[in-house]
């Protein structure tokens, strides 16, 4: 049990140490008329490296062939292209207050069927090193389908089941630990009581012998 606890704690520490930036895939099913978040996360390989980043998003509507630019975000300024499909519907939801963008996500409000298609999140990053600078670029591709109502995918169902299984396992483990500790404390208490009783009997016996010796001497 102690080994299991050590493994759990160790995993938590590792997770927290690497938890500064985690690349997560976006959801791909948007509900008509609702607000939908398209995730785009691009982590630096070395967090201590200074960098400046900007992004451009492009979109290819379902049934068409060409990608068109819908926005650019640079120096904390969101520049939207003139496009009726996205007019008044795009909201920046990525990193703020920094030029070193790692979360480049957006919201699309009041989703319509015209928003079904392929999105590309282009990430352009300039890395500053001691003696030189280095440009990198990454493209995150996301395919979005717009549906009438939300459908739970298999991944979310499995995740929920695993969560409940984990809760049950941890509860059983906690109860077992409590029972184990209780038995250990009870055994230690009983041993201490027996030891005290033995000492008391030994002292009583010795006192009687001393008293008998005194009487004989008299």
Curated annotation (Swiss-Prot):
<dbReference type="Pfam" id="PF07686">
    <property type="entry name" value="V-set"/>
</dbReference>
<keyword id="KW-0739">Sodium transport</keyword>
<keyword id="KW-0812">Transmembrane</keyword>
<keyword id="KW-0472">Membrane</keyword>
<keyword id="KW-0393">Immunoglobulin domain</keyword>
<dbReference type="InterPro" id="IPR027098">
    <property type="entry name" value="Na_channel_b1/b3"/>
</dbReference>
<keyword id="KW-1003">Cell membrane</keyword>
<protein>
    <recommendedName>
        <fullName>Sodium channel regulatory subunit beta-1</fullName>
    </recommendedName>
</protein>
<feature type="disulfide bond">
    <location>
        <begin position="21"/>
        <end position="43"/>
    </location>
</feature>
<dbReference type="InterPro" id="IPR013106">
    <property type="entry name" value="Ig_V-set"/>
</dbReference>
<feature type="glycosylation site" description="N-linked (GlcNAc...) asparagine">
    <location>
        <position position="135"/>
    </location>
</feature>
<keyword id="KW-0966">Cell projection</keyword>
<keyword id="KW-1015">Disulfide bond</keyword>
<feature type="topological domain" description="Extracellular">
    <location>
        <begin position="19"/>
        <end position="157"/>
    </location>
</feature>
<feature type="topological domain" description="Cytoplasmic">
    <location>
        <begin position="180"/>
        <end position="218"/>
    </location>
</feature>
<keyword id="KW-0732">Signal</keyword>
<dbReference type="GO" id="GO:0017080">
    <property type="term" value="F:sodium channel regulator activity"/>
</dbReference>
<dbReference type="InterPro" id="IPR013783">
    <property type="entry name" value="Ig-like_fold"/>
</dbReference>
<dbReference type="InterPro" id="IPR036179">
    <property type="entry name" value="Ig-like_dom_sf"/>
</dbReference>
<comment type="function">
    <text>Regulatory subunit of multiple voltage-gated sodium (Nav) channels directly mediating the depolarization of excitable membranes. Navs, also called VGSCs (voltage-gated sodium channels) or VDSCs (voltage-dependent sodium channels), operate by switching between closed and open conformations depending on the voltage difference across the membrane. In the open conformation they allow Na(+) ions to selectively pass through the pore, along their electrochemical gradient.</text>
</comment>
<feature type="signal peptide">
    <location>
        <begin position="1"/>
        <end position="18"/>
    </location>
</feature>
<dbReference type="GO" id="GO:1905152">
    <property type="term" value="P:positive regulation of voltage-gated sodium channel activity"/>
</dbReference>
<dbReference type="GO" id="GO:0005886">
    <property type="term" value="C:plasma membrane"/>
</dbReference>
<dbReference type="GO" id="GO:0001518">
    <property type="term" value="C:voltage-gated sodium channel complex"/>
</dbReference>
<feature type="glycosylation site" description="N-linked (GlcNAc...) asparagine">
    <location>
        <position position="114"/>
    </location>
</feature>
<dbReference type="GO" id="GO:0043204">
    <property type="term" value="C:perikaryon"/>
</dbReference>
<keyword id="KW-1133">Transmembrane helix</keyword>
<comment type="subunit">
    <text>A voltage-gated sodium (Nav) channel consists of an ion-conducting pore-forming alpha subunit functional on its own that is regulated by one or more beta subunits. Interacts with SCN1A; regulatory subunit of SCN1A/Nav1.1. Interacts with SCN3A; regulatory subunit of SCN3A/Nav1.3. Interacts with SCN4A; regulatory subunit of SCN4A/Nav1.4. Interacts with SCN5A; regulatory subunit of SCN5A/Nav1.5. Interacts with SCN8A; regulatory subunit of SCN8A/Nav1.6. Interacts with SCN9A; regulatory subunit of SCN9A/Nav1.7. Interacts with SCN10A; regulatory subunit of SCN10A/Nav1.8. Interacts with NFASC.</text>
</comment>
<dbReference type="GO" id="GO:0030424">
    <property type="term" value="C:axon"/>
</dbReference>
<feature type="glycosylation site" description="N-linked (GlcNAc...) asparagine">
    <location>
        <position position="93"/>
    </location>
</feature>
<feature type="disulfide bond">
    <location>
        <begin position="40"/>
        <end position="121"/>
    </location>
</feature>
<feature type="glycosylation site" description="N-linked (GlcNAc...) asparagine">
    <location>
        <position position="110"/>
    </location>
</feature>
<keyword id="KW-0406">Ion transport</keyword>
<feature type="domain" description="Ig-like C2-type">
    <location>
        <begin position="22"/>
        <end position="150"/>
    </location>
</feature>
<comment type="similarity">
    <text>Belongs to the sodium channel auxiliary subunit SCN1B (TC 8.A.17) family.</text>
</comment>
<keyword id="KW-0915">Sodium</keyword>
<keyword id="KW-0325">Glycoprotein</keyword>
<feature type="transmembrane region" description="Helical">
    <location>
        <begin position="158"/>
        <end position="179"/>
    </location>
</feature>
<dbReference type="GO" id="GO:0006814">
    <property type="term" value="P:sodium ion transport"/>
</dbReference>
<keyword id="KW-0813">Transport</keyword>
């Amino acid at each position: 049990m102690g080994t299991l606890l050590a493994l759990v704690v160790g995993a938590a520490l590792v997770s927290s140490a690497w938890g500064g930036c985690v690349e997560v895939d976006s959801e791909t099913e948007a509900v008509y008329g609702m607000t939908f978040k398209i995730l785009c996360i691009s982590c630096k390989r070395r967090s201590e490296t200074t960098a400046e980043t900007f992004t451009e998003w492009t979109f290819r509507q379902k049934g068409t062939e060409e990608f068109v630019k819908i926005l650019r975000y640079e120096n904390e300024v969101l520049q939207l292209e003139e496009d009726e499909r996205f007019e008044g519907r795009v909201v920046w939801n990525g990193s703020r207050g920094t030029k070193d963008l790692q979360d480049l996500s957006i919201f699309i409000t009041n989703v319509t069927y015209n928003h079904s298609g392929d999105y590309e999140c282009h990430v352009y990053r300039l890395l500053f090193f001691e003696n030189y600078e280095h440009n990198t670029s990454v493209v995150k591709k996301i395919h979005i389908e717009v549906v009438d109502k939300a459908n739970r995918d298999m991944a979310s169902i499995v995740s929920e089941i695993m969560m409940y299984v984990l809760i049950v396992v941890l509860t059983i483990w906690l109860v077992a630990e409590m029972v184990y500790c209780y038995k250990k404390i009870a055994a230690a208490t009983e041993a201490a009581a027996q030891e005290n009783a033995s000492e008391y009997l030994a002292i009583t016996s010795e006192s009687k012998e001393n008293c008998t010796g005194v009487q004989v001497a008299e």
